[in-house]
């Protein structure tokens, strides 16, 4: 349900139903592998039973990844490249019933409804390159460099860089 959790005054819907589909394709050879994955989701909530949120439209979400890995001419060494988009709401909105004024003589509040979009301002794209060394006696060393464009799907966010490493010993 795309982490739609609410409690108390905000618990307006009680349930949400999500239909989610993922397609995976792989091409694997001795020295080269290619993988593609694409996910699509649709989430619908029940009718609102609260006063603050009056309606949530159907939410559509997507995610994808494309990766390639190949073995170098040096035994035990592999290089990889990947590009991906983490789960993102593509469209949908929530109707909010918000107070806009108050009549001082009757103490009655006036309300208006506004549609707030739930799709983020940007689209995060992650680009990653990596190196894997698989040595003898269970030793492996992986290093990856990643660059995130529009982190957290925020169009105003600066790009983020990450360096990851993993050492494994088996005995």
Regions found by a protein language model. Give the residues of each.
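Detector for repetitive beta-architecture
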Residues: 31-33
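Outer-membrane beta-barrel "beta-signal"
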Residues: 78, 158-171
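Outer membrane beta-barrel transmembrane domains
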Residues: 1-15, 20-26, 35-157
